[in-house]
Amino acid sequence: MKEQEREAYEYANAMPRNLFKALADFQQEVPVIHKGTTGYGYTYADLPAIFEAINPLMKKHGLGFTQLMQGTSLETRIFHVESGEYLQSFADIPQDVQLKGMNNFQVAGSAITYFRRYALSSALGLVTDKDTD
């Protein structure tokens, strides 16, 4: 086997196949999550709405997630419960943002919540849209 073929073989066998299959199955079933919260001049799907939509399907497909702060970065980890395979991403949370009428702790909490929503949505391939009902 040539070196390049061996590297390709090793890479393919190191892929988190169980996680990828479970994630693909999850993505086929997860609904569009409606944006039902308004704030700061725009409409968005809040974390409770996202959790309500994804948690039963994540359990069904053997998936879980964690979101932990690592210094000023948010680590989002999507994992396959049985195999332990995981994907992770990091998002740096800006520290120099100021919002009118909010103290530094409120701004930090708002930023963390904002990044949690978007990091989780991105990692899971979620789609959010305005509720037209």
Label each region the model flagged.
Residues K2-D133:
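Polyanion-binding surfaces on beta-sheet-dominated domains and ring/shell assemblies
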